[in-house]
């Protein structure tokens, strides 16, 4: 008697349709861009429970300017982006952008990542579209050679 075939269809859940993503943001002295960074995180059209925002801040020279100088500031940002998880790290030495991106990618929590710069505006579908391209093309990395530059008069 032939064996019964198992149902090979996987159920679609947020976990497999929208995998967990670490949003990686390297920065130094970018405090004026915090409202823009928060707006990007809040308006991504992606399940917020699947996201972690991992910020790496560093020192440059004698200045010690931190994006998140204390627990009170961190809590305020966490409340603004909830339920996105916030992971903030400060390293008290000068680092190149390449060092920061490497550190972030080695220490991220989730299996996928998106590099999100502090002073850029992202369309709301940025994360969903990136995951869609990865799955559709069966590749491990996606990006775009095209950029749109705008110069807002607002001082974020």
Could you describe each region identified by the protein language model?
Residues 19-22, 52:
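Cell-envelope/extracellular polymer assembly enzymes that use nucleotide-activated donors
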Residues 39-50:
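Short, acidic, metal-binding catalytic loop of nucleotide-sugar glycosyltransferases
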Residues 49-61, 89-91:
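Short beta-strand/loop segment that forms part of the nucleotide-sugar
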Residues 55-74:
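A conserved acidic beta->alpha catalytic loop
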Residues 91-108:
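Glycine-rich, basic loop-to-helix element that forms the pyrophosphate-binding segment
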Residues 113:
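Short aromatic/hydrophobic "clamp" motif used to bind/position activated sugar donors
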Residues 117-121:
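The conserved acidic donor/metal-binding loop of glycosyltransferases
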Residues 127-155:
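Conserved donor NDP-sugar-binding/catalytic core segment of glycosyltransferases
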């Amino acid at each position: 008697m032939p064996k019964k075939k198992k149902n090979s269809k996987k159920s679609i859940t947020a976990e497999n349709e929208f995998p967990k993503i670490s949003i990686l943001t390297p920065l130094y002295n970018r405090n004026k861009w915090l409202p823009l960074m928060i707006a990007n995180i809040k308006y991504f059209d992606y399940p917020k429970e699947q996201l972690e925002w991992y910020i790496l801040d560093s020192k440059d020279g004698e200045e010690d300017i931190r994006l998140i100088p204390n627990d009170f500031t961190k809590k305020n940002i966490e409340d603004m982006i909830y339920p996105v998880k916030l992971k903030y790290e400060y390293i008290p030495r000068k680092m190149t952008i390449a060092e920061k991106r490497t550190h972030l990618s080695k220490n991220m929590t989730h299996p996928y990542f998106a590099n999100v710069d502090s002073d850029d505006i992202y369309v709301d579908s940025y994360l969903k579209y990136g995951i869609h391209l990865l799955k559709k093309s069966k590749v491990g990395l996606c990006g775009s050679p095209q950029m749109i530059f705008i110069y807002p008069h607002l001082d974020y």
